[in-house]
A protein has these predicted regions:
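Alpha/beta-hydrolase superfamily serine-hydrolase fold, recognizing
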Residues: 51-250
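A glycine/proline-hinged amphipathic helix-loop "lid/cap" segment
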Residues: 1-65
Length: 250
């Protein structure tokens, strides 16, 4: 790891320990007390709020260069955190790559809405894109952490149901194993600056399961069937507790 990387890692670890993020994540304090300033959409974009029956979405559209493809973004947060402004910024960055539209899904979260709420919302968002005229080969699924797990679970469900598959899957540090059984959960326990050194982090929270087995493939897609899925990109850091969730999937 570079000197710059070590400095950033140490800063994250210090902040996490000082703020006791593990307990605050688990009891909902962090989610309830985190207030953000209003997000300002760049002038070259239109950010359209879309009100679904049980959740909200936002469609970011470039005013000029529209490539005709769309990225369905599923945010992270351990299935207990709502969408934040950082993901709106991510949407802008995604769009600027090629002129993509970006549909960001503010899916329902636990503990108020355990599984399958978030999964159902992701599926409904994908169906909304199909009904809106996008073919599967013009849809890209992207997500990080819990959102990355949702991306993979959704793709497996679409294949199982014979529905149009997306063009590709992009997953950053996806949470694909809610049993936390991979070796990196132990090997990187002292190294991970965000989730390490606490058994009270979101990784060990069962609030999302809602009485279901953590080995169900649409909950932990690591235990699912990877055949006949679209091309997949996994990105994960070597010191993350979620490292095994990507390596084992490959």
């Amino acid at each position: 790891m570079s000197v710059k990387g070590r400095i950033v890692t140490d800063m994250i670890r210090f902040f996490t320990a000082q703020k006791m993020l593990g307990p605050k994540i688990q009891d909902g304090t962090l989610r309830k007390n985190l207030v953000e300033a209003p997000w300002h959409c760049p002038e070259e974009y239109i950010n359209l709020p879309i009100h679904m029956r049980q959740f909200e979405m936002e469609l970011l559209t470039p005013k000029e260069e529209d490539c005709g493809e769309v990225i369905l973004q599923l945010h992270g947060g351990g299935y207990i955190a709502k969408i934040r402004n950082a993901y709106r910024d991510f949407a802008v960055r995604y769009s600027r790559i090629k002129g993509y539209r970006v549909l960001s899904v503010d899916y329902r979260v636990a503990p108020e809405h355990p599984y399958p709420a978030a999964f159902q919302d992701a599926l409904e968002a994908y169906r909304w894109l199909l009904y809106s005229g996008f073919t599967g080969d013009r849809i890209i699924l992207a997500g990080d952490s819990a959102g990355g797990g949702l991306v993979l679970a959704l793709a497996m469900y679409l294949r199982d149901q014979g529905m149009p598959l997306p063009q590709k899957l992009i997953m950053m540090s996806p949470w694909t194993d809610l049993t936390a059984s991979g070796p990196s959960y132990q090997e990187n326990y002292e190294k991970d600056p965000l989730f390490g050194n606490t058994r009270e982090s979101m990784i060990y929270s069962g609030e999302y399961l809602g009485g279901h087995s953590p080995k169900e493939p649409y909950i932990s897609p690591l235990f699912g069937d990877f055949s006949k899925l679209p091309p997949m990109l996994f990105q994960v850091g070597g010191i993350e507790m979620l490292l095994s969730d990507s390596i084992s999937a490959e």
